A protein has these predicted regions:
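Conserved phosphate-coupling serine/threonine residues in phosphotransfer and NTP-handling enzymes
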Residues: 113
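Secondary-structure boundary/capping positions in well-ordered alpha/beta enzyme cores
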Residues: 42, 67-68, 106-107, 129-130, ...
């Protein structure tokens, strides 16, 4: 990775959702195990859980029911599930609310995620909805990450150039989408990803952005 670029031009901060804004492993485990149990299949393996953390619900069910005669029925079932019982298992990542509050209004804030219909429920449940100017879920694009469509939509909305945006993610699909969109990639709690910056805590972002005053830190 080349030297980190100047951040003086940045005006849009884009976040992934699962694993970055929220800790959703417990919720996702319960959700997909519920579907598997419905069709008499064993619970998620660790490798399957790693996959579903970063995929759309449709891709997750396709993988879990690969070769199964119930795959289409399972897809219909996952689309019909009421997500609300699983929301209680979600946890916001540490200091995310404080970081978002400090970023605004100096920066626009947005979400680009492969999470689908549950995204508005998640943001409302955790009190994060008012802290974002724009959200793009898998339901808002025709091609999900690692395709950059979600990021390109955000750039278009804010009339921003790629050099004026950064994307904070925790997975290889986030890195690939950033590269293809041309935006600066910041890795969250994943030192294995090639990134301009690595964060272990969301408050660390405030230390590298020039338009956040010391009073906000």
């Amino acid at each position: 990775m080349p030297d980190a670029p100047s951040l003086t031009a940045i005006k849009v901060i884009i976040y992934d959702c699962d694993g970055v804004l929220i800790d959703s492993r417990g919720s996702n485990t319960a959700f997909y195990n519920h579907i598997l149990e419905k069709f008499g299949l064993p619970p998620l393996t660790p490798r399957q859980l790693d996959f579903v953390q970063f995929s759309t619900a449709q891709a997750a069910v396709d993988l879990l029911f690969q070769g199964s005669p119930w795959r289409e029925e399972a897809q219909n079932y996952q689309r019909s599930i009421d997500n609300r019982p699983f929301l209680a298992l979600l946890r916001p990542e540490p200091h995310i609310r404080e970081a978002l509050a400090a970023l605004r209004p100096a920066y626009h804030t947005a979400i680009a995620t492969n999470r689908g219909k549950s995204l508005p429920l998640v943001l409302r449940e955790l009190g994060l909805a008012p802290l974002f100017d724009l959200t793009i879920s898998s339901y808002d694009v025709t091609r999900q990450k690692p395709h950059p469509e979600c990021l390109l939509k955000i750039l278009e909305h804010f009339r921003a150039a790629a050099a004026e945006a950064m994307y904070i993610g925790d997975a290889a699909v986030d890195l690939e989408a950033s590269r293809r969109a041309g935006v600066i990639f910041v890795a969250y709690r994943n030192p294995d990803l090639e990134a301009y910056y690595h964060l272990q805590d969301h408050l660390e972002l405030l230390e590298i952005l020039p338009r956040v005053s010391k009073a906000d830190k």
